[in-house]
Amino acid sequence: MQVLAVVPVQRLEQAKSRLAPALEPAARQALVRELAERTIRILRSVPAVAVIGLLTPDPSLASLASRWGVRTLRDAAHGLNDAVRLAQAEACRLHLPALLIVLGDLPLLDPHAIRHALALLESPGVVLAPDRHGTGTNLLALAPPDVIAPAFGPFSRWRHRRAAAGARCTIRELWSRALVLDLDTPEDLALVHRVREGER
């Protein structure tokens, strides 16, 4: 199943403000760019990903997207759910059977996790990867692209599950080490360092 894969990224000056106790603004912005570029490289290595879009209101990131060889879907900074609705419309316009949303702050992401998520996807269906707290959503795959409305935010895991039940479509959850950890707080940053140290 061919998909449009999108990576949502906030404006650089607003991104990762909760990391302020651990990182200066320039370091936070560099981290956001690095993670976004890494996510795009991983998506490009997955054959089922037909088109990649960077979902951002930030003009500087839009210029980087061009350099990275992906299209920019400019959202109007009204929030992640509005941005994902824009991506849903784009996937339908491209006549692609599925949409994949991968948050751009997953430092342990790998191609196998993406392939696994897409292998689980049925149509009509939803695949979601929860965060490490078991309440959020770090990856969401939808077939068809508009099978449910996006419900990112607090307790999004449960809201996406309810939406899938309401749509009477298959829902599968993927618990993956590569997908559970998103970088939001100094605690997350320390956890990533511990995981990487343990791999050496």
Curated annotation (Swiss-Prot):
GO molecular function: GTP binding; phospholactate guanylyltransferase activity
Classification via InterPro entries: CofC, Nucleotide-diphossugar_trans
Record has Nucleotidyltransferase as a keyword: yes
The entry's keywords: GTP-binding, Nucleotide-binding, Nucleotidyltransferase, Plasmid, Transferase
Annotated EC: 2.7.7.105
Catalytic activity entry: phosphoenolpyruvate + GTP + H(+) = enolpyruvoyl-2-diphospho-5'-guanosine + diphosphate
Binding, phosphoenolpyruvate: 137, 153, 156
Pathway info: Cofactor biosynthesis; coenzyme F420 biosynthesis
Other known facts: The exact nature of the substrate is currently not known. This entry has been annotated based on its similarity to Actinobacteria.
Function: Guanylyltransferase that catalyzes the activation of phosphoenolpyruvate (PEP) as enolpyruvoyl-2-diphospho-5'-guanosine, via the condensation of PEP with GTP. It is involved in the biosynthesis of coenzyme F420, a hydride carrier cofactor.
Family: Belongs to the CofC family.
Protein name: Phosphoenolpyruvate guanylyltransferase
Gene: fbiD
